[in-house]
From Swiss-Prot:
InterPro entries: DNA-dir_RpoC_beta_prime, DNA-dir_RpoC_beta_prime_bact, RNA_pol_asu, RNA_pol_N, RNA_pol_Rpb1_1, RNA_pol_Rpb1_3, RNA_pol_Rpb1_3_sf, RNA_pol_Rpb1_4. This is DNA-directed RNA polymerase subunit beta'. The lineage of its organism: Bacteria, Pseudomonadati, Verrucomicrobiota, Methylacidiphilae, Methylacidiphilales. Belongs to the RNA polymerase beta' chain family. Pfam families: RNA_pol_Rpb1_1, RNA_pol_Rpb1_2, RNA_pol_Rpb1_3, RNA_pol_Rpb1_4, RNA_pol_Rpb1_5. Mg(2+) binds at D464, D466, D468. The gene is rpoC.
Length: 1390
């Protein structure tokens, strides 16, 4: 057996397309344009109105563009293929295929040169840059308003000076016609461009850049130099930006189609070309006739405008319109936007052999099957049918086979069965938000018109059966079928790529059936039951149950099947377990390795069981279990017949008590407000909080009352549905049977009066009216936000599309440090969850036993992650894509597990696209969620206290505190934190505490687990005095810096600081009681309320003023999505915070130009930084505070770019990661960190050059980090001076447009700008990413198309075996590895 080096495609008889490795774009010279052309178009006519034949020399001329009929010249002298290539002597048309009319171009010779609008008007204007003129001046010249001095001669005129009509006449009169040359229009510009020596200009610019200090000038010179270098490198002359010859695109790309009634529909381009030709011909005639200059100039300007309109209509002046005032579509419009060439025809093609239909549920299907209507299959598999009919000898020609199929001969159906057996189809549901929206299934032919799908894949497709439609595609080639079977088959996609959790989890009826089956017995029944029968095995229980001797939820004793053996769920210590017949039946479908599951199994638990099942027994058995689970769930739900009635919505008895208590508390707050103890804002916040707590309390109580079901001897169906996760959620139940709660105004504010009623009791007219607000806004929001979410997904895709696994291990020892995430005192993300599936950087040792848990470079699986957590590790350093050092793409070790397959990521896996899908998909889903809750305010109530999570010793670290009368401590400093230590001094937990918090336990004392040891006022930010003394006011002047406010309701007067223009700075000074010198002073921000009077005596820790916290707004994803977009776009948030640039001590620098000057001095180095902060911003640090680099000095969100500048890359990465995760976490969406890390990596891949050294970079140029390091390495090796650069943070839109690939950038946004830039610089597209390869018609360089798998050696196998296998329709196993004979398949497929 000899091995031949053949590629898979050659073996299967595919023709190799002409391959190319890169694509270059540059500006065409007039000679090039003429070389493309087959002839000049002189006649503006299109076709003859009588004969409907193309006019000679016109826009559809057959002599230029080729014949309209195959193998036939225009006059009909030569017909048929035998005259191929003959040029007719009568009509001059070449005898050839009419298809050439799609590729042959013509040209128009312009009477005068014309500027190309892209190079003139696309900002920054390339013509303006190279000529060093402003775009405005250039326009005046090009549109024939001013003269441009091309050659000043001996006159005092300057080169490139603009002269108005009058100035030109005066100059002529003064110096004479021969003395100087000044011209108008594009001709003048062309003459100047012709004089430019690019190399000399480049040298001059470089010298000028080195010689200047001005940043402004340097920036401008760098831009010009970049353009000049680009032109030199691409061997382009600048005068080619001025057109002398205009190409005419092939006629079949701008067709003229006859409609009925003798009218014609034409492409707008024909109208635009006709205008150009008409004006050009008229100008030629006028030039020969010695016409007055004014007329000629006007005609030249009109020609310039006609060409502008053809190239980019609407960019200059008003757009040229056609019938009905519609702007005509120019060449640029055909490229850009959703309907342009890139997005419509190159990236989104219509697919042959596809169909779509409504979907219905197919409960009888197996997971790898789908039901395909016979009518659809007949059309989709037609070519296969024809081949099979001929093979079987039923027909001999294709035509008769087609007729047979059309007639639907009974024989056809049998053949159809044979053809479709084992031939997979792909099912897709729009919107295709992630890769699980297209999966492969084996078609089962069914009657009827609807496609049937398996209930368990609905979650992945997000499909329901209220009229959803799905598309079917047939993979045709052998490779496509193979990939469908080995990679896309539904049983292979059990896990979600975004979180690694099972996605084929049961929903709705299946969940309900299983949950009902595994319910514990009712308490009443248990009391009635006399004895618990004992059974020896499951079979006995099932017999007894089937014979009616047992009820499903009777309590029974069963001999423990897991006694003495370790299983996942079983209890190996008990000999007998207490269970119910229902649970015994439920356990029959799971493999015995899992053990006996003896708890109620709701949606969440079922997901857990599926995951454990996969980990224990592998995929094949799990898939069988899933199908059994589906059968069981449906059967039991049907038998149980669970349905809800109005009596099942039990309003809890405690509701009235809770509400009256809330009303009392509200009255107390109102009284406090009326007595002036609190402000209106505080009153509002307190009332909202009271009702939020009351609503939460009622929610808890409802659940209890539903579970008890008023003591009836049956399960409450509403409780079963919600508790199992089958239907509805807690909020909906609360609204049905509890309290509707607080509602939001359309502005997002919460209305402080809640809706007390629920739907069971019915709403009053007023309550109903209030609730319409939120419900309507929800619907409007959903419609608007879906588009935003889709756009975010698209931007993410574009930025991450070319991130692929390119190597196994890049060998770096860098990584990131991760730890568990806490919110308040609750652990919300465990350490084990964050490190699972990642590669460890450092050795981790169990401190108790000294055993090595994980070695460097080892993958942390679930078991290891648990062990690390149990070993008490707080922080773990793991490999991350953020620190990956692979040339392009990322390496498998830095990425870790592929969550969808639970295996290490493989070469060629497109992790970037998966990251984009994982982040974008929940965004789209979450916008739909508002729609279901119906406008009730979801308000997160935060406890204003900290509880200890462990027993330990409290330690104050860098905290400044003041002791109060009752032995508590008030926190005065912003920096520092509280720690809880174990007896050996190891830190167990740490908490940041806000200024004004009261610590209830002194430093060094013990705290018990669960004990509250810090409290604070949730409604105000206090300003506290650190020293005791006498109060004195400074710059607190009524009517200027403060106002006295009389509250109408409370009749109380309060002093409020107001915004003011004067150079005054309200401060409260504290004077020493004896010496009367100033010992402390506090700036009071606008909006604060002063609580002391001059001359008052205060003690340390007393509150002297307070600023109310902001009003409460609702939190939902609509607030979240814009936040995610803001983070990924790296926008500067409004009202952003100021952050400290160095470590040091805060000093007050007084007030300068209406801003507060803060100095931070580092006592070690003596360096200091100053910050100028607007007076309206509230400072959260005080004089003498110790601050760390990057710490906030004022309130507000932080600017990401500043974190990068001050703290460096790692802090920024951590900040972005945590901020994005927080938004998703709030919605209960799980996304693995690695996906967000990939996007952040792409945002940080550029470096800004500060000093180019001896490299070829330019000042302030943004270059790829790897390119930067590579170039530096080369220069350093030669002993030169390397470049210096700083990392920059780009928003995802900017990062997408800044890729190496101009094709990908052009297909994303700003098409004309991208192409203009690419053409002037002569860019080369290396075709590395996905989009550019799809556009060029190549396989994408990822997955099976990855370069490693492209050229695989095939081993020839003896033909008989191969054929034998082929006959049997089962070449490949059931979703597992393919048969052994074809050795090449596993490599190609995986």
């Amino acid at each position: 057996m000899e091995a031949k080096n053949l590629t898979a495609r050659q073996v299967l008889g595919f023709q190799k397309t002409i391959g190319f490795d890169e694509v270059r774009i540059s500006i065409a010279s007039p000679e090039t344009i003429e070389s493309w052309s087959k002839g000049e178009v002189r006649n503006p006519e299109t076709i003859n109105y009588r004969t409907f034949k193309p006019e000679k020399g016109g826009l559809f001329c057959e002599r230029i563009f080729g014949p309209t009929k195959d193998w036939e010249c225009a006059c009909g002298k030569y017909k048929r293929i035998k005259y191929k290539g003959v040029i007719c002597d009568r009509c001059g048309v070449e005898v050839t295929l009419s298809r050439v009319r799609r590729e042959r171009m013509g040209h128009i010779k312009l009477a005068v040169p014309v500027s190309h609008i892209w190079f003139l008007k696309c900002m920054p204007s390339r013509l303006g840059l190279i000529m060093d003129m402003t775009a405005k001046d250039l326009e005046r010249v090009i549109y024939y308003e001013d003269y441009l001095v091309v050659d000043p001669g001996k006159t005092p005129l300057r080169f490139k000076q603009l002269l108005s009509e009058q100035e030109y006449r005066d100059a002529l009169a003064q110096y004479g016609e021969e003395a100087f040359v000044a011209k108008m229009g594009a001709e003048a510009v062309r003459d100047i461009l012709k004089q430019i020596d690019l190399q000399a200009l480049a040298n001059d610019l470089t010298a000028a850049m080195e010689g200047t200090r001005s940043k402004q000038l340097k920036k401008k010179l760098a831009k010009r130099l970049k353009l000049v270098q680009g032109l030199i490198n691409s061997e382009t002359r600048p005068e080619w930006m001025i057109l002398e010859v205009l190409p005419v695109i092939p006629p079949d790309l701008r067709p003229l189609v006859p409609l009925e009634g003798g009218r014609f529909a034409t492409s707008d381009l024909n109208d635009l070309y006709r205008r150009v030709i008409n004006r050009n011909n008229r100008l030629k005639n006028l030039l020969q006739l010695k016409t007055p200059d004014v007329i000629i100039r006007n005609e030249k300007r009109m020609l310039q405008e006609a060409v502008d309109a053809l190239l980019d209509n609407g960019r200059h002046g008003r757009a040229v319109t056609g019938a009905g005032n519609r702007p005509l579509k120019s060449l640029s419009d055909m490229l850009q936007g959703k309907t342009g060439r890139f997005r419509m025809n190159l990236l989104g093609k219509r697919v042959d052999y596809s169909g779509r239909s409504v979907i219905v549920i197919g409960p009888e299907l197996k997971l790898h099957q789908c039901g395909l209507p016979k009518k659809m299959a007949l059309v989709l598999f037609e070519p296969f049918m024809i081949r099979r009919l001929r093979e079987l000898g039923h027909v001999h020609t294709v035509r008769t086979a087609k007729k047979m199929i059309e007639k639907q001969d009974p024989l056809v159906w049998d053949v159809l069965e044979q053809v479709t057996a084992g031939h997979l189809v792909l099912l897709n549901r729009a919107p295709t938000l992630h890769r699980l929206s297209i999966q492969a299934f084996e078609p089962i032919l069914i009657e009827g018109d609807a496609i049937r799908i398996h209930p368990l894949v609905c979650t992945a497709y997000n499909a329901d059966f209220d009229g959803d439609q799905m598309a079917v595609h047939v993979p045709l080639s052998i490779e496509a079928q193979l990939e469908a079977r080995l990679l896309m088959l539904a049983p292979l996609n059990i896990f979600s790529p975004s979180s690694g959790k099972p996605i084929t989890t049961p929903t709705q009826d299946i969940t309900l059936g299983c949950y009902y089956l595994t319910q514990p017995p009712l308490k009443i029944k248990v009391q009635e039951q006399k004895r618990k029968p004992l059974f020896s095995d499951a079979q006995e229980v099932i017999f007894a149950y089937n014979d009616g001797l047992l009820q499903m939820h009777d309590l029974i004793l069963l001999k423990n099947p897991d006694y003495g053996r370790s299983t996942v769920f079983g209890d190996k210590n008990k000999k007998v377990i207490e269970t119910t017949p229902g649970r015994v039946i439920f356990n029959q479908i799971w493999p015995p390795e899992l053990g006996f599951y003896n708890k109620p199994a709701g949606k969440k638990q079922l997901g857990e069981i599926i995951l454990k099942c996969y980990q224990t027994v592998g995929r094949e058995k799990t898939v069988q279990c899933l199908d059994n689970l589906k059968e069981l769930g449906f059967a039991e739900a049907t038998k149980a017949g669970i349905s809800i009635g109005i009596d099942d919505m039990i309003v809890p008895a405690e509701k009235t008590r809770i509400i009256s208590k809330a009303y009392e508390m509200v009255n107390v707050v109102e009284r406090q407000y009326r007595s002036g103890a609190i402000t209106d804002g505080e009153r509002y916040n307190k009332i909202v909080d009271i009702w939020t707590q009351a609503t939460e309390e009622i929610s808890g109580v409802i659940y209890k009352s539903l579970e008890n079901n008023l003591g009836r001897p049956e399960y409450n169906p509403l409780f079963l549905m919600v508790d199992s996760g089958a239907r509805g959620n807690r909020q909906q139940v609360r609204q049905l049977a509890g309290i509707r709660g607080l509602m939001a105004k359309p502005s997002g504010e919460i209305i402080e009066r809640p809706i007390i009623s629920n739907f069971r009791e019915g709403l009053s007219v007023l309550e109903y009216f209030i609730s319409t607000h939120g419900a309507r806004k929800g619907l409007a929001d959903t419609a608007l936000k879906t588009a935003d979410a889709g756009y975010l997904t698209r931007k993410l895709h574009d930025v991450a599309q070319d991130v692929v696994i390119t190597m196994q291990d890049c060998g770096t020892n860098k990584g990131i440090i991760v730890q568990a995430i806490y919110e308040g005192d609750e652990e919300i993300v465990k350490l084990s969850e964050r490190i699972y599936g990642r590669v460890c950087c450092d050795e981790i040792i169990d401190p108790m036993t000294g055993r090595i848990v994980v070695r460097p470079g080892e993958l942390i699986d679930e078991k290891k992650a648990k062990e690390i957590e149990e070993a008490g590790a707080e922080k773990v350093k793991i490999r991350s894509v953020l620190t990956c050092e692979s040339k392009w793409g990322v390496c498998a070790s830095c990425y870790g597990l592929n969550l969808a397959t639970n295996r290490m990521a493989r070469l060629g896996e497109s992790v970037g696209v998966i990251a984009a899908q994982s982040i974008g998909e929940p965004g789209t889903q979450l916008t739909m969620r508002t729609f279901h809750i119906g406008g009730t305010a979801s308000q997160v109530f935060k406890q204003p206290q900290i509880r200890a999570r462990n027993d330990g010793i409290v330690q104050y670290i860098d905290l400044r505190t003041v002791k109060t009368v009752d032995n508590h401590f008030i926190v005065l400093s912003k920096s520092g934190y509280l720690a809880v230590l174990d007896p050996s001094g190891r830190e167990l937990e740490r908490h940041t505490v806000i200024v004004g918090s009261i610590i209830l336990i002194p430093d060094g004392e013990m705290v018990k687990k669960g004990q509250v040891f810090v409290q604070w006022d949730p409604y105000n930010v206090p300003i506290l005095t650190e020293k005791g003394g006498i109060v004195e006011f400074r710059d607190i002047i009524e009517g200027v810096t403060v106002k006295k406010e009389l509250d109408e309701t409370t009749k109380q007067i309060s002093t409020i600081v107001i915004e003011h223009k004067h150079d005054l700075h309200p401060q409260i000074l504290i004077l020493d009681e004896n010496t009367r010198e100033v010992i402390a002073f506090y700036g009071i921000p606008a909006g604060a309320r002063i609580e002391v009077k001059p001359g008052d005596k205060v003690v340390a820790g007393q509150r002297i003023a307070r600023t109310p916290r902001k009003m409460v707004q609702t939190k939902d994803i609509t607030g979240g999505l814009p936040r995610v977009a803001e983070l990924f776009e790296a926008r500067k948030p409004k009202d952003s915070a100021e952050i400290a640039k160095i470590d040091g001590i805060v000093e007050d620098g007084g007030i300068i130009r209406g801003k507060r000057r803060i100095l931070i001095r580092d006592p070690q180095t003596g360096s200091e930084e100053e910050h100028l902060i607007p007076l309206s911003k509230h400072l959260i640090v005080y004089k003498g505070d110790v601050v760390k680099k990057g710490q906030q000095l004022t309130e507000g969100p932080i600017v990401p770019q500043e974190i990068l500048d001050v703290c460096g890359i790692q802090e920024l990465q951590e900040y972005l990661l945590n901020e994005v995760q927080e938004v998703y976490r709030l919605q209960g969406v799980e996304i693995n960190d690695k996906h967000i890390e990939i996007i952040i990596k792409q945002m940080l891949k550029k470096v800004k050059i500060l000093d180019a050294g001896d490299t070829s970079f330019l000042w302030e140029e943004q270059v790829d980090r790897l390119k930067f390091e590579e170039e530096n390495r080369i220069i350093e090796a030669k002993g030169g001076k390397p470049a210096v650069g700083i990392p920059v943070l780009l928003g995802i839109t900017k990062a997408s447009l800044d890729t190496d690939s101009f094709i990908a950038a052009a297909s994303f946004q700003d098409t004309t700008r991208v192409l203009t830039e690419a053409a002037t610089l002569g860019k080369v597209d290396p075709l590395k990413g996905f989009k550019e390869n799809i556009i060029m018609g190549n396989l994408i360089p990822s997955g099976t198309g990855f370069r490693t798998y492209r050229n695989i050696r095939l081993v020839e196998v003896a033909p008989p075996e191969f054929k034998e296998e082929k006959k049997e329709q089962k070449i490949y196993g059931n979703g597992e590895e393919p048969a052994k004979e074809q050795k090449w398949i596993p490599q190609a497929g995986t």
